[in-house]
Amino acid sequence: MKLVQLSRPIIRNALAQALLTAVALASAQAALAQQSDAAQQAPEQAPTTLDQVKVTGIRSSIQSSIDSKREQTVVADVLSAEDIGDLPALSIGEAIETITGAATHREKGGASEISIRGLGPFLGSATFNGREASNGSGDRSVNFNQFPSELINTVAIYKTQRADFVEGGIAGTVNMQTVRPLEFGKRRVQLDGRATYADGDSKLRNADGVGWRGTVSYLDQFDLRGAGKLGVSLGLQRLEGTNPEEVMSSSSTWTACNANEVVGASRNCTAVTPAQVQAGTPYYLAPGSRVYRQISEHDQRDAAFAALQWRPFDGLEVALDYQDSQRTVTEDRAELNFSETLRNLNNRQVGDNGALLGHTGSSTVESSTDYKVRDEQYRGGGLRVEWRPNAAWMLSTDLSYSRTERSEIDRLMRLRSNATDINGNRVPGINGQRVDYTYTYAGDVPGIVVDPAFDLNNPDNFSAAARARRDELRREHTIRAWRFDGAFTPESGLLTSIKGGVRLSEATYRDLDDRVERNVTDPATIRAANLACRQPFPQEDFLSSASGNTIQQWATFDSRCLFGAITGVDDTGRNADPRGTANSDVEEKTRALYVMGEFASTLFGLPLDGNLGVRWVRTDVSSVGLRGELDVVDNPDGTIQLVETGRFAAQTVRASNRVFLPSFNANIGLTEQTQLRFGLYRAMARPDLVALSAGRTFILEPGTEFTTVGEAIGSITATGNPRTQPLLSSNADVSLEWYPNADSLLSAAVYYKQFTGGAVPTVVDERFVIDGTAVVVPVVQDVTTRQKSDLTGLELTGTHRFSYLPAPFDGLGVKLSYNYADSNYKTQDLRLGDQIDPATGLVSSGIVAPANIFGLSRHVFSGQLYYAIGAVDLQAIYKYRSEYFQKFVGAPAQNRYVRDSGTLDLRASYRVNAQLSVSLEASNLTNEPRISDMPVPGSFREYNTYGRRYYLGVRYRF
């Protein structure tokens, strides 16, 4: 942590550093140019053959990436490798992080969702081999963990749009490309094995030990004589490993409490209204619960890739590819839950923005377990046919399919504190079922100190309100698409090509959320389960790297044992009728047409080329939601459940939109080494598919003392809004790029985006029949506005190899990238932000300040220092991202902010010979945690730590 904290002031000056680097590189190149002129004046000197030396490793990847960027017809950045498995990263997500302007959200310690130019994943698009790919999250991002990096050789980010690109990329489009076997041009069999180790595994009592990842790939070409040429690519991968986590977290529902009141010991704080806050009533922000969570995990992935490329004769090509990836993640969680943190809140210390920094309180304490199994399978592929009947015409068609199925089953158990233990003895330090505690936030994590008379480590003390839940979430996302493209090449004139095409796609998203619950209060049953399922705390040194932590362990129980002891079975299975009001059933049909012209000419004697086009897109949405009556079930602990009766009526909501997306890109060759690019375009970003859901979720207030069912229901939240319109953006980009030699690049880009559209929460009263009684409850959902907002940004990239230094320093090189973005976009908090009156259209002021646009980091920096000479490749990679707003995927929620973070990775490889190489890699050497706040910055929500990871690899090619 200290290393990262020291680096952050440097990062805040990253723009100045990048400019200084640019000047230094330019000066160095000027010196090189002078040396080159002097060399030309000495004809007796023998010509060098340096350019004929075969370049490999990281230097080869950088050269290939520079060449690819230079050849693009739009503003773009590319990470490319001539050979398979040569992308310099452990995963596709980590590879993308090194591309200028790209940043990732970290899950399980690795890169997941991609933000481009500081904009979240829903403002960008991601394609695999040029096609949309499904995922199991309900959003439009791509699960990069599903794709083995060893089988991908190019990742490109197109930052301006072209009419023939699939729509959706306001921020940009990420395209992952597998190798094309005929273009590869040689036979290759490759075996790649890596041993993996997470240092957090050493803390576990039941450690997984060393994991592994094995990949085998085969590429070949065949001459079929009269039937043309055939290329084949096959790849298989198996992965097994572990990703332990240590977490302190809070609930995702926050209340603005009246700071003038003294909260009684037997009740929750009183929420303030926006009108009270506007009138000067002070408030503080508090969650419904706090939880400590220890996670042991096992991860397994099997992947298979196949591609055929057939050229029966010149002018005709048929390509078929298929991908299959199945991943199973098994988690065993032990949790200590303070479930009533709105109760008896006093002696408060409050920050300027309402963040709660310290207080006393009383809460029920729960020892909980969760045995979670997630299975996710991706299947995708496509058939592409390209025909050139003559030199002037090219016709192509592409048929694709992508489907992801995710099943997530949680078996959750809870044992609560009580006035007496399992033997009937009075428990010291407890009042009723609640324990007094103090909360102090002064370190990395808050410290919670309970009454010292109450022993958190004594399992006897968790003797009440046993609850077993089986939650099952199933998601299915399918994309079917077809496109046809044609291109005509004129013999002469300004236009070098005229293109046009059509694309049809159908995306479906369905989810099912099922819960089976068993509540037990019988003391004998609870005592027997408690005694039978006790276990030692699963790890040592829990949250030892987090300053301020006060709880290192607590009484825990075997998750599967406890579930079986309470329910009588290992798995209850789901309900006979799993339908529910929260389920989603969304269908989205898209039709797109485009026409585009490519041109080449001169401007003031300088070469000019580019493209001009327009894309028309129509989107039709059909979303089905269920409405039905609910029964109230009283739990033995005094709380309630809302159980659907099974009598449902389907409501179908339909919506559509049409947009025109013009685009213009131009490239001016200022010199042989310098290019000036321009991009003007309009782009769209569709809402996530899950955000188009027509379902409803019920949020129950914590506690037991309510006079009516209406009081117990905190709110009903719409799972989405099918009428949500796409976010539109008018964009302008200018990029100046200098390519002094094969190892060097210096570029600067400025860009501007004006957004039209956004979302503001609205509250609509809806009538529900609950326990036979009509209850009117406010339903919160986002509605689309026509508000305008702006974003401006700057990108800097510098890549250089110091080949002019004396040996052995001539192998040193550096790659630096920096992105700055700023926007006045506003994302209102779902519960505490501005809200719009649906009847009048008037906006009422909220309590907390809005967040910016999803995923916006003002500063994103990536720095690589590498040493590549002979058979040795060494890399140090530092990645930094400033604070950003991160939405929850799957259902609307309040605003969450992820704090700034920086991670350091090291990689080393050695080529023993042309066939054999070995590598050693380490990630997150700074042991950087992920810390998030809600619903305002500085209001602690969660601390996740994953630890460092190490990889030892061997590769053999023949």
Enumerate the predicted regions with their spans:
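N-terminal periplasmic "start-of-domain" segments of outer-membrane beta-barrel proteins
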Residues: Q52-L87, E113, P121-G124, R131
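Extracytoplasmic beta-strand/coil segments of soluble accessory domains associated
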Residues: G93-E132, K159
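Short acidic/polar hinge/loop motifs at secondary-structure boundaries
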Residues: R131-K159, G209
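Transmembrane beta-barrel wall of Gram-negative outer-membrane proteins
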Residues: N206-R343, H359, E366, V373-N390, ...
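Solvent-exposed loop segments that connect transmembrane elements
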Residues: E246-Y292, D332-T369, M413-A468, V520-P536, ...
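Outer-membrane beta-barrel signature, preferentially recognizing the C-terminal barrel domain
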Residues: S363, S367-Y378, A582-K589, A655, ...
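Gram-negative outer-membrane beta-barrel transporters
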Residues: V750-F888
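C-terminal beta-signal and adjacent terminal beta-strands/loops
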Residues: L812, K879-V889, S909-F958
